[in-house]
Amino acid sequence: MSKPIKQIHLAAHFPGVNNTTVWSDPAAGSHIEFSSFAQFAQTAERGKFDFLFLAEGLRLREQKGEIYDLDVVGRPDTFTVLAALAAVTERLGLTGTINSTFNEPYDVARQFASLDHLSGGRAAWNVVTSWDAFTGENFRCGGFLAEDQRYERAKTFLQTAQELFDSWRGDEIVADKANGVFVSDPDAGAFVHKDAHFDIHGRFNVPRSPQGRPVIFQAGDSEEGRDFAAAAADAIFSRHSTLDAGQAFYADVKGRLARYGRHRDELLILPAATFVIGDTDAEAADIAHQVQLAQVSPQTAIKFLEQLWNRDLSDHDPDGPLPSVEPVVGDNTISRGRASVRMFRDSIAIANDWRAKAEAENLSTRELIAEVMGRQSFVGSPQTVATTINDLVQADASDGFILVPHITPGGLDPFVDHVVPLLQERGVFRAEYEGTTLRDHLGLAPLPARSNHDLGRRSADADAATGVAS
């Protein structure tokens, strides 16, 4: 029996505040003005993409005590941008990254339920945790949460928010003008939740939204992150976009679903990838080389080098070999607020690996940094890129890709104009949206509302928590 042909899922990531974005390119626009977000989202919708994805950083990055300003600095609030985009798009899903460490479930649930209403059922939440006290200082929290507790809090945070989403069935609002009755159930929105992190009870004030809950994304790659995704997420944002790494990650995460009573098609694996398209493969390779040089300037190469070596290397030649001195090991780092620092736990071992690679391939410091810090990219003619993406999806290396252009807001256009039609011709990508909600686009089953029995029991628990007799 032949294997069914999979449909490809595509999404667009508005580039974040990192060196993927070539903000100095003459074609690059603002990362602050709404017109850039609107143009980017409308291009993704024109291409029939599943959703737009926004990352989020809660503190400006620093290096050697100064703002890291080689990349884009600053970004408008995620919810504000997504709510505005809901008004200028009709079908495109709207995915926002919201932190579970420095927020509260009630606030986040209200915001996502509201976004789901305003967008007609297109909201999604990428649940992330924060690992450093540096970010926590913005919230007067410092390092209040040990790193090994962050997923525990994230799990209970999500569970609490889901209980709030489910506190309405969806049929309570009757708006009976003749009899002056607005809701049919006096217990609508009642909730009570108590665990090691949250102790809340009351009434949730946003009625059930079109999807019931936002689609849940997760982006962690640790063992805890993979288990969290297998237990609770609808999709996972992955960095494993090559064939071997993608297949290994795909098999691992999909293989965990059964232990949580879930089927393999209930979680989508969506790696992020950049792309460079040319009329020919050779032209695309030339363009990609120029993009890589723009992404890893001499200054950027030195900054990345300093993050691993944890010492001032401002006098180092980026076109020369790697430093002969060893990295400085310790809790005090010269780079703060950058996720890549977490990858450098064993800095001496990584430095030795880098030296071996540089020597074997005759790479300068800058060339080495561009190789090891670059994101997986699809490079080639439209035909080559379309074939590569389809081959990876059909080989179960992914269920699709979250595409990250290096220029905004117009960097998505070449893919939409030249690659999407080829995928549509091959019958592996939609020609039109078939549904209206993000769950529809992702092929996820609708979420059933909680029964009257479940809601009544929760209302009684809430009354007991507040001392109200039932």
Residue spans for each PLM region:
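Active-site mouth loops of central-metabolism enzymes
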Residues: 21-35, 97-106, 142-144, 148, ...
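Hydrophobic or amphipathic alpha-helical targeting/insertion segments
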Residues: 88-89, 93-141, 145, 153-157
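N-terminal beta1-alpha1-beta2 module of alpha/beta enzyme domains
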Residues: 2-88, 211-214, 436, 453-458, ...
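Conserved, mostly hydrophobic/aromatic
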Residues: 10, 44, 48, 85, ...
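Acidic (Asp/Glu)-rich catalytic clusters
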Residues: 2-5, 45-46, 82-90, 116-122, ...
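Hydrophobic faces of well-ordered beta-strands that scaffold small-molecule active sites
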Residues: 8-12, 52-54, 92-96, 121-127, ...
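An alpha-helical appendage that flanks or caps ligand/catalytic pockets
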Residues: 2-16, 148-211, 244-247, 251, ...
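Catalytic domains of carbohydrate-active enzymes, especially glycoside hydrolases
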Residues: 32-57, 228-238, 389-400
